[in-house]
Regions:
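Amphipathic alpha-helical assembly/interaction segments
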Residues: 1-126
Length: 126
């Protein structure tokens, strides 16, 4: 996930330089920040234990969802042409699916851990 997001950022950086000035310093800057914050959240999550990862994965999901909307606005205002929008939105959608899968796996593992801790066998041991 991190490697793909990094390649999206490098692609975005080239497009960012060519945005109209009116959007470069508003929407463009916000999109840039969202990408950096997503990379940061995923990097942090990758170094944490399973129990600690989920909040950071969820932050990354929110950032990526917001990023999709901001890119759509740039495209709808004709500040980003079709080719550039497609080049960015496809991989970003894929990142969103990957993060959703990661979040689902973490949820399942955390639920299994919680169920084991609350199982009747554990209660009998006490």
């Amino acid at each position: 996930v991190l490697e793909r997001l990094k390649s999206i950022y490098l692609l975005w950086y080239g497009f960012y330089q060519t945005l109209p000035k009116a959007h470069r310093h508003s929407l463009g800057q916000r999109i840039d920040n969202l990408l950096v914050e997503s990379i940061e959240a995923i990097a942090i999550a990758s170094f944490l234990s399973r129990q600690e990862k989920q909040p950071y994965v969820r932050v990354a999901i929110r950032k990526v969802d917001t990023l999709k909307i901001m890119l759509m606005i740039l495209w709808e205002t004709k500040s980003l042409d079709n080719k550039k929008y497609i080049a960015l939105s496809g991989p970003i959608d894929e990142i969103g699916r990957m993060l959703g899968g990661w979040n689902g796996q973490l949820t399942k593992v955390l639920e299994q851990t919680r169920d084991k801790q609350n199982s009747p066998a554990k209660a009998e041991e006490k």
